[in-house]
Amino acid sequence: MAQVAIITASDSGIGKECALLLAQQGFDIGITWHSDEEGAKDTAREVVSHGVRAEIVQLDLGNLPEGALALEKLIQRLGRIDVLVNNAGAMTKAPFLDMAFDEWRKIFTVDVDGAFLCSQIAARQMVKQGQGGRIINITSVHEHTPLPDASAYTAAKHALGGLTKAMALELVRHKILVNAVAPGAIATPMNGMDDSDVKPDAEPSIPLRRFGATHEIASLVVWLCSEGANYTTGQSLIVDGGFMLANPQFNPE
């Protein structure tokens, strides 16, 4: 029986690229979408072209806990789960002094509560299967350093990083490995870009002087799902073109 990977928010961007690269590795793929059903269907068509199975379902992590139950439907349809990639997320920007509490809670509901519930559903099934598994949380460089005027997003990503470590420690006894991937400035629809925007010298403030491509995140996710990562758990792997190394003394010239 084929292994199964479920990637949340895989209708576009990093999630879609994770789905396609894992399909190339022979995984059957569970695809979720929030508002772009056609994007999810496009992902499914590309996944199936690699000779594996694809199932799609709408996932609304703004409506919890009920919304997360869609993950159970995917697991039932696919028969099992071996990998969960928590890619769904939300963000908003506002100065700390102006941040409304309901906006703060919306970000935490999707980015932290949603990942918690999806991980719990997946991990319980993995324990039941008795063969271990992998859970990968897509965080952000802002898990490690603040984004100005985005206190809710920054705090939520820090919380998801902490949850990653707590899950890793508790689930290792079940051979479930839990890690995070922390992207920097990646050319995704959330950032108003796509991979065509990955051009040399497009972003001089980043030491590599460009935005990242979605496959540069997804390829690390694939590695974390491989035997090569059998000794890796509780880590947050930063992929940022050197962004975290830059400081006021950094001269892009």
Curated annotation (Swiss-Prot):
The keyword tRNA-binding does not apply. The active site is at Y153. NADP(+) binds at residues 6-30. Its EC number is 1.-.-.-. It is an enzyme of class 1 (oxidoreductase). Pfam families: adh_short_C2 (PF13561). Keywords: Oxidoreductase. One of its GO terms (biological process) is monocarboxylic acid metabolic process. SUPFAM superfamilies: NAD(P)-binding Rossmann-fold domains. GO terms for molecular function: oxidoreductase activity. Substrate binds at S140. It comes from the Bacteria. Belongs to the short-chain dehydrogenases/reductases (SDR) family. PANTHER family: 3-OXOACYL-(ACYL-CARRIER-PROTEIN) REDUCTASE, 3-OXOACYL-[ACYL-CARRIER-PROTEIN] REDUCTASE FABG. This is Uncharacterized oxidoreductase YohF. It comes from Escherichia coli (strain K12). The gene is yohF.
